[in-house]
Amino acid sequence: MRILLTNDDGIHAEGLAVLERIARKLSDDVWVVAPETDQSGLAHSLTLSEPLRLRQIDDRHFALRGTPTDCVIMGVRHVLPGAPDLILSGVNSGANIADDVTYSGTVAGAMEGTLLGVRSIALSQEYEYEGDRRIVPWETAETHAPDLIKKLMEAGWPEGVLLNLNFPNCGADEVKGTRVTAQGKLSHDARLDERRDGRGFPYFWLHFGRGKAPVADDSDIAAIRSDCISVTPLHLDLTAHKVRAELSAALGVVELGG
């Protein structure tokens, strides 16, 4: 099985090294094409106004000055000697759950792989802070991901669907199970902090946070809060199908394919 790895935290990220160890428990044919620099929060963006510069580190490790989407395209269309059987994106430092999946470059790597017709999985590891220090229990994802991915590959999933895996903030031996979940909902809280530079001109820092909101029992949020691994199937079709009939009636048009 040929596996392509990417991420959004960059080629030097610890999570990418964890992902490679996970992948090597599944196959010896593992390739890495990851961003040269941190691309967190760039979602499914791709580079159109600048050239893509590819740096070969060794036979199967490449760094690209581009986004996770760029990396997947580069890997599939140029770097690999043939199409991959699986694309793994991650392991992200921090969970990618609920609405955050729309911002996530990690999830976007799996989205692009799915668009290219390759089975794709995004992996993220929740963490906590001790003072100013981020504590990421990488061993949780590294321990549980290989067997979970094997089972998922054996089960299979439809075209146009990617899998979003999130590992809880607990030790590997403290995980209480795996849940197949729905994408949750968090309260949106984005703020701008205006400051002044040395010449008095304004600039801004974006503070991105989440407020409290009701949590559904079947959601990805509830799963990782319960120290369970969350497996969320996401599909690329963004159509709000339940609303189509209502809009068709309101506009007096015939709903096709309903």
Curated annotation (Swiss-Prot):
EC number(s) from the headed UniProt entry: 3.1.3.5
Reaction catalysis annotation: a ribonucleoside 5'-phosphate + H2O = a ribonucleoside + phosphate
Cofactor binding annotation: Binds 1 divalent metal cation per subunit.
Subcellular location: Cytoplasm
Major localisation: cytoplasm
Superkingdom of the organism of origin: Bacteria
Needed cofactors: a divalent metal cation
Gene Ontology cellular-component terms listed: cytoplasm
Family matches, as InterPro entries: SurE, SurE-like_Pase/nucleotidase, SurE-like_sf
Family assignment from sequence similarity: Belongs to the SurE nucleotidase family.
Function (record text): Nucleotidase that shows phosphatase activity on nucleoside 5'-monophosphates.
HAMAP family: SurE
Identification of the protein by name: 5'-nucleotidase SurE
Gene assigned in the entry: surE
